[in-house]
Amino acid sequence: MKAEHLSLAVSMGETIDGLDLRKGQFAKIFIDGGVFTQAQLDECDWRDADARESVFDRCKLQGAMFNGANLRRAVFNQCELAHADFRNAHLHGATFSECTLTHAQFAAAWLGMATFSRCRLDHASLAGATLESAVITDCSLIDVNADDSEWKHTCVLQCDLAQLTWAGARMTRAVFTKTALIGKSFAGLVLDGCQFSFADLTGADFAGVSLKQCNFQGSVLDGAHFNHAVGPHALFCGAQGEGVDFSNAKLRQALFTAGQFPSARFDGADLYQCHFANANLVDASLAGAELTYADFRHADLSRADLRQATMFRATLHGARTDEAQMTDRSRALETDPELARAERWTASA
């Protein structure tokens, strides 16, 4: 089918159902609002086409070229898009549902408010792409190249990002929830306001990274590195990790409430007014840390090393300190007897 015939059919509201248009030359065509169902469109040339608000349902588009195409609010449902080329394409509000996008190219594409749901993006390229307010849910992004990409207000939920790289990426209030980020390096990135709640960050590297107001609530942080990170007001409530390295980090007024951090290292960290209530800090090292006004009420500090730490008016109410070493304990606030009695009180029948 010639490009002009396809454009005419679409403009008249005809559904392109089951047609074989493989290797079709449709560059710069106008097919906005077109509906394609179970069509064979492998290796078609859609470069610079205007396909805004078009629908591709259960189509085969392997190796298709959409370079520079206008795909604003286009829908791809259960499509085969392996090796498809979307470089420099405009995909604002586009939807990809249950699509195969392995080795697809999205370099420098605009993906503002785009949605990827239950898609396979393994080995794809997002290099230089802009993901603003995009949503990626239940997707596999194994070995994806996202270097120099921008993630602004983007939400990633229950995805596998194993071996994904994002060197030089820019992130602003991005959300990674229940997502596997094992061993991921965030070195050189600015992550202010990003959310990592209930994510698996085992062995992740945040060394020297800006983490202002980041949220790690409920995350797994075994062996993660936060040394020299800057994260005032960061949230680690309910997070858990053994041997986490927070040494020399600047975490003023961060919340570690009910966190599980046995054998963690906070040596030399700035933990001014941090909240560690009900936290597990057994065998942790806080040597030389700034703990002024820190709150350790009901925390477990058994065998913790707090030598040379500044503990001016740090709260130790109800904390377990068996075999803990504290050279500045005299300036801390010990258990308040009246408050302890009130906490043990139960209303009589």
Residues of each region from the PLM?
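Tandem repeat scaffolds
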Residues: M1-A349
